[in-house]
């Protein structure tokens, strides 16, 4: 069962595949004519379409009954005059193509170049790629390494001061009078410190004298030089705490002789006593020489 009569099909295809249509199509496509074989074109196309057959009816089981029953009605469909409509299509297509080409040629070259650079600018491509990479890297870093908040600055522990190890009475700052300058205040503080030192020394001497006195009220004296003031009492030939500090050191070293006296001793005589061991030896040698000379004179006088 054929869809269209053979004569009508041949006329329709011949009208569609006319020579003018192919020429117009080749001009618009800008294809070289050497690649197209125009010999025996119409005969080949007609032969190919004649070999075609309509599909079998088994492929359309749900086809409506009107189409299946009225096959003759479809064959009597009104014939469309394709050859008449083709020139109108050619004219409309050619007018549109000419208008588009004129519009493109009338455009200034600067706009074309700018559009070309806008579309194919390597800088924009690099910026877009760099932006996409940076956003990707930022996202990955945020996921892989979460940023912690700012750490609060801890106060450093203060160093231990000497005042904690050696507590002393806090010094009260001296109030400077409006009439006195700062230099006078500084000198007054130094004088005050010197006075404190003197008082401390006097109390020390008083304590040494108090230690020298016995419980019975008798003042202690050195058995060798008879001094009463000494920083420390030492052991002597008469017992403990019987010699002053200087005489006790000489007694321990074995150089305590009758000619030795400290300069602060009340019994010190420069012609007889000395606080230097070398001078004491010289004095003894002179005494021995004088004794020897006196003995020789006595023997000579007797003879």
Swiss-Prot record:
Source species: Arabidopsis thaliana
Entry GO MF terms: DNA-binding transcription factor activity; sequence-specific DNA binding; zinc ion binding
Record-linked PROSITE patterns: GATA_ZN_FINGER_1, GATA_ZN_FINGER_2
CC annotations in GO: nucleus
Pfam families attached to this UniProt entry: GATA
Protein name, as recorded: GATA transcription factor 11
Zinc finger (GATA-type): 216-270
Sequence segments annotated as region (Disordered): 131-189
Biased composition, class Polar residues, residue ranges: 131-141
Similarity remark: Belongs to the type IV zinc-finger family. Class A subfamily.
Compartment(s) where it occurs, according to its Swiss-Prot or TrEMBL record: Nucleus
Role description: Transcriptional activator that specifically binds 5'-GATA-3' or 5'-GAT-3' motifs within gene promoters. May be involved in the regulation of some light-responsive genes.
Annotated keywords: Activator, DNA-binding, Metal-binding, Nucleus, Transcription, Transcription regulation, Zinc, Zinc-finger
Positions with biased composition (Basic and acidic residues): 169-183
